[in-house]
Amino acid sequence: MDGLDGDEKVLEIARHKMSKLHSDIQFVHGFSFELPYPENAFDRVISSLMFHHLTREDKSKTLHEVYRVLRPGGELHIADWGKAQNAIMRTAFFSVQLLDGFLTTTDHVTGVFPELIRKAGFADVKEENRFMTVYGTLSLYSAKKLD
């Protein structure tokens, strides 16, 4: 299992925390839109609260990279902000947009993000679940690489 991050300080914190658990996780410095892995390297890719920090262009590049490194039949699982389920959730998400930027978060709150996943070649794109939080709607997405 690999953990990837573009910030060496974050990787050091992760390494330190996981060393106490004697885990078999390899932490790799790299960026999601230029994954340092060969084609068909993984059966599953998981992302948590990362995509809403990326511009639409980098979201697209990242999704294409994930598609590239997944084996046929591989799965993508994403936990990130989703389409606001009601006016209260839309208002709550405004604080996230102020902090993280409107440019990078609009695809999520408006519900465009699943279509970006499809455009990268993924099939069976689903919103598996959603949760209302004090900051907005958190969605759990899944998708598959068929070929």
Locations of regions flagged by a protein language model:
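C-terminal alpha-helical "lid/dimerization" subdomain adjacent to the S-adenosyl-L-methionine
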Residues: 77-120, 124-139
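A short acidic, Gly/Pro-enriched loop at the edge of an enzyme's catalytic core
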Residues: 33-45
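A short glycine-rich, Lys/Arg-flanked "PGG" loop and its adjoining helix->strand segment in the class I
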Residues: 60-72
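C-terminal lobe and adjacent flexible extensions of AdoMet/dcAdoMet transferase-like proteins
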Residues: 140-147
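A short SAM/SAH-binding and catalytic strip from SAM-dependent methyltransferases
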Residues: 44-57
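A generic structural signal for alpha->beta connector loops
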Residues: 22-24, 73, 122-124
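Class I SAM-dependent methyltransferase SAM/SAH-binding core
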Residues: 1-34
